[in-house]
Amino acid sequence: MYDSIMSVSARNALSRLSETVAEKGVGSASAPQAVPAAPGASFGEVLSQMTGSVSQKLQAAEATSIQGIKGDAPVRDVVSSVMEAEQSLQTAIAIRDKIVQAYLEISRMPI
């Protein structure tokens, strides 16, 4: 049950991140090394790729957890997969918070 709640919470966080990117219409920037993107990709496209990657990691961790419950996967693999997914989610949340913070700071600037 805890895993179900966490996966729903993670999906909600990812959807809020995607909505934030879509609503704010952030400009273009070069892609970070961790996320492969086409040259000249917009910042929004890079973030969309990142959210897709985080979503895949969360789904893989959930699948590994289910296999671990069934006894088909070693505990070490389950813990590793869940920790990797948690790290990715925390990174996505931190990036979302920084984007919102930057937007609010820009919106407070005098014209």
UniProtKB/Swiss-Prot annotation:
**What is its subcellular localisation?**
Bacterial flagellum basal body
Q: Which HAMAP family match?
A: FliE (MF_00724)
Which PANTHER family does this UniProt record tie to the protein?
FLAGELLAR HOOK-BASAL BODY COMPLEX PROTEIN FLIE, PTHR34653
- Protein name as annotated: Flagellar hook-basal body complex protein FliE
Which InterPro entries does UniProt cross-reference here?
Answer: FliE
Q: Which residues cross the membrane?
A: none
Question: Gene Ontology terms, cellular component aspect?
Answer: bacterial-type flagellum basal body
Report the Pfam families cross-referenced here.
Answer: FliE
Q: Which residues form a coiled coil?
A: none
Question: What protein family does this chain belong to?
Answer: Belongs to the FliE family.
What keywords tag this UniProt record? Bacterial flagellum
Q: Which GO terms describe its biological process?
A: bacterial-type flagellum-dependent cell motility
